[in-house]
Structures are given as C-alpha cells and as structure tokens.
Curated annotation (Swiss-Prot):
Its EC number is 4.3.3.6. SUPFAM superfamilies: Ribulose-phoshate binding barrel. CDD domains: pdxS (cd04727). The gene is pdxS. Gene3D superfamilies: Aldolase class I (3.20.20.70). In the presence of PdxT, forms a dodecamer of heterodimers. GO terms for molecular function: pyridoxal 5'-phosphate synthase (glutamine hydrolysing) activity. This is Pyridoxal 5'-phosphate synthase subunit PdxS.
Length: 299
C-alpha cells in the first residue's frame, strides 16, 4: 500500500504541470523569463542540448549551486537532469530538493544497460521514450512522467513526431487485442516485445493511454511545433534549445505557452506566431552521424 501511495503522489505532481510548458534554463535571468512567460516549470542545466551537441565531451549533472540559485529565484517547480543509470547524481538532486529528476539521454549515460531504480526515490522522475516498450519499461522502473526523446538540440521536431506516433500505435495495438479478447497475443506482446509485466499492459488497455502523463520533447522550436505535438495527444511540452537559441526569447517563450494551451485554435496560433524573430537554426537529422544521435541512448 505504501508503494501505491508513493506512486500516486509522484504521478500527482507530474499531473500538476499537465497542459504546460517546461523550459530549459541555464541561469536565473532565463528562469525568470520562463516564469513570466507562463512556463509550468523550468529545467535547470548548465548547457542546453544544442550546446552539448556542439561542444561534445562528457555531459554530467549540473552544479547543485546553480540549480539552487534558480530554485531560490522562481516560484514554479524546478527540474534537473541526471545521467542514465547514475543513481548517485539522482540522490544528490533529490537531496537539494529538485521537484522532478529527468533521467536524460541528453547527458552522457553512466550505465549503458541499467536505468535508475526510480522506485527507490521520493522525488518523481521523467524519462524519455521512442516507443511504447521504452515508455512502459521506464514506468515499470518508477517513472512518473514520460516524454518523447525526439532529437534534442536540433530544432527539428521530426523525431518527436515519430516517437509519439510509435507510442500511439503501440497503445492502439494493446487496446485492440484487449477489446478483441486476444489475451494470448497480449501476453506474448508483454513478454517478448514490450518486456514489461502484464499488469502494466492491462492498465494501458483499460485507460487507452499511458498510465502517466506523456510530454513532447526534442526539437520543439515554434508555437506550431508545440501545438502539433499536443494535437497528437501529448499532455504538455518540453522546450530546450528552441527558446534561448532564438532571436527573441521572451516573445517566443510566451507564444509557445499560448500555443500549448490553445493547441486546437489555429487562428490564435497564427497570431502568436507573428514577429517572433529568428528561430534557432535547425539541423536535419540525416546530417547527424549515427554515433551522435542522442535518442538511441537508453532502451
């Protein structure tokens, strides 16, 4: 019963930022801009994904002092990233009071096989996923929120779209098998393809969606990008490099928040998309060497 209560508490926090925008920030000034723009939360990190991609090297957890400065400066929730499998980085982030931990493929993985046992923590976790199997495995480990991996730092939404479609298609298969009474197929799918307990599969079949909130992330750079992902069924969006690598961060941040809340109103999205200044320079995915693709980290 204690485990259930803890899971409900973690998932409850994740639902608090539903329909909102989480913005990457690297300093107090950016965090205040994000808060004033209406961000539901900020992700505190020393380098946005675009800079990590360009500068290379080993990307690690941010300096706790920088994260605490941002926590002191804003009233909205503050998230921070830990490396995949690096449970000590997660312990540190929990100890300084971050509101949610992102076990992130944007940072250099500490463990290429094992993810963090998120059930051992009080703080809720968000994790990336490219398909239903990855999403459910992270939920089985204790994740309270899922996000598409996309391809961070590119300003190109194509991978986020691909990952969201893959999750939706997987859910449709589960629901279809369940409604047709094909329990043997569901058991086989759980065991051989998704590699998760049947209990989670049945929860998906009943809810007809993931049992936790599912945000879009990776390559979102414009209000239309945010609305696109929301119309595909996302519960909110993460925006990394797309705001503070653009020509007018303050206006673009507000526009993306407006588009996320009003994702089904094209006239309003068109209005807030006017005169935003230059968007961040995007990268075509096929121009990225295979070994530099971040979304492949952590399956």
């Amino acid at each position: 019963m204690k485990k259930l209560g803890t899971d409900l508490l973690k998932r409850g926090f994740a639902k608090m930022v539903k329909h909102g925008v989480v913005m990457d920030v690297t300093n107090v000034e950016q965090a205040k801009i994000a808060e004033e723009a209406g961000a539901a939360a900020v992700m505190a990190l020393e380098r946005v994904p675009a800079d990590i991609r360009v500068q290379g090297g080993v990307a690690r957890m941010s300096d706790p002092d920088m994260i605490l400065e941002i926590k002191d400066a804003v009233s909205i929730p503050v998230m921070a990233k830990a490396r995949i499998g690096h449970f000590v980085e997660a312990q540190v982030l929990e100890s300084i009071g971050v509101d949610m931990i992102d076990e992130s493929e944007v940072l250099t993985p500490a463990d290429e096989i094992n993810h963090i046992n998120k059930k051992a923590f009080t703080a809720p976790f968000v994790c990336g996923a490219r398909n239903l199997g990855e999403a459910l495995r992270r939920i089985d480990e204790g994740a309270a929120m899922i996000r598409t991996k996309g391809e961070a730092g590119t300003g190109n939404v194509v991978e986020a779209v691909k990952h969201m479609r893959a999750v939706n298609e997987g859910i449709a298969r589960v629901v279809g098998y369940h409604e047709m009474g094909l329990e043997a197929e569901l058991v086989q799918m759980a065991r051989n393809e998704l590699k998760v307990p049947m209990e989670i599969i049945l929860e998906v079949a009943k809810l007809k969606r993931l049992p936790v909130v599912n945000f879009a992330a990776g390559g979102i750079a414009t209000p239309a990008d945010a609305a696109l992902m929301m119309q595909m069924g996302c519960d909110g969006v993460f925006v990394g490099s797309g705001i503070f690598k653009s020509g007018n961060p303050e206006i673009r941040a507000k526009a993306i928040v407006e588009a996320t809340y009003n994702f089904d109103k094209p006239e309003l999205i068109g209005e807030v998309s006017k005169n935003l200044g230059e968007a961040m320079v995007g990268i075509n995915i096929d121009q990225i060497p295979e070994e530099m693709l971040l979304a492949k980290r952590g399956i």
